[in-house]
């Protein structure tokens, strides 16, 4: 399911009750990337409570066509504990308050990955240094380096 369809699903069921911010209300791309890197670092360290602290309450999680609205840090930490893979960030692109991160999946401390070596992607909606939503999306195609003959 593409990100736009997934986001539309989340909006249609009222999961993203907070309206999208205007460009003036966004964190800087550098600050947004810092939040995504902190999330990845905490996930890889199996610091599920620490990862949960990066999220606003409530927070929305969309994965595999299912959407969850989690209300507490304990719920968010449990969700992280159930993730099967750790991963290394390959790239992060930011547009407004949306950051798309591509990861190379791996086993980790207390994690037995079902697809080590494969790439996965997620879109993070970040505002004021907190993650409001995490949406698994298809890995975007590599950026082209220009026209080819």
Describe the residue ranges of each PLM region.
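Bacterial N-terminal signal peptides that target proteins for export
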Residues: 1-8
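Short, low-complexity N-terminal intrinsically disordered segments enriched in polar/charged residues
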Residues: 11-48, 53, 57, 143-148
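Hydrophobic pocket/interface hotspot
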Residues: 39, 50-52, 59, 75-76, ...
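A short gly/proline-enriched turn/hairpin at secondary-structure junctions
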Residues: 54, 59-69
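Short beta-strand segments enriched in hydrophobic/aromatic residues
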Residues: 55, 105-107, 138
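Residues that flank catalytic or metal-binding motifs in active/ligand-binding sites
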Residues: 55-57, 85-88, 120, 127-130
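Surface-exposed, charged secondary-structure patches
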Residues: 73-116, 123
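Short beta-strand edge/turn micro-motifs at domain boundaries
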Residues: 100, 117-149
């Amino acid at each position: 399911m593409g990100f736009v369809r997934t986001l539309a699903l989340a909006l249609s069921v009222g999961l993203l009750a907070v309206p999208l911010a205007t460009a003036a209300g966004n964190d800087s791309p550098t600050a947004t990337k810092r939040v995504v890197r902190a999330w990845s670092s905490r996930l890889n360290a199996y610091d599920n409570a620490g990862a949960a602290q990066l999220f606003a309450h409530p927070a929305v999680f969309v994965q595999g066509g299912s959407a969850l609205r989690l209300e507490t840090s304990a719920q968010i930490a449990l969700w992280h504990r159930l993730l099967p893979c750790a991963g290394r960030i390959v790239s992060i692109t930011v547009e407004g308050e949306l950051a798309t991160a591509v990861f190379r999946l791996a086993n980790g401390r207390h994690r037995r990955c079902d697809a080590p070596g494969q790439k996965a992607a997620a879109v993070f909606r970040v505002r004021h240094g907190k993650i409001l939503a995490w949406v698994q999306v298809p890995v975007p195609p590599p950026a082209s380096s220009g026209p080819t003959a």
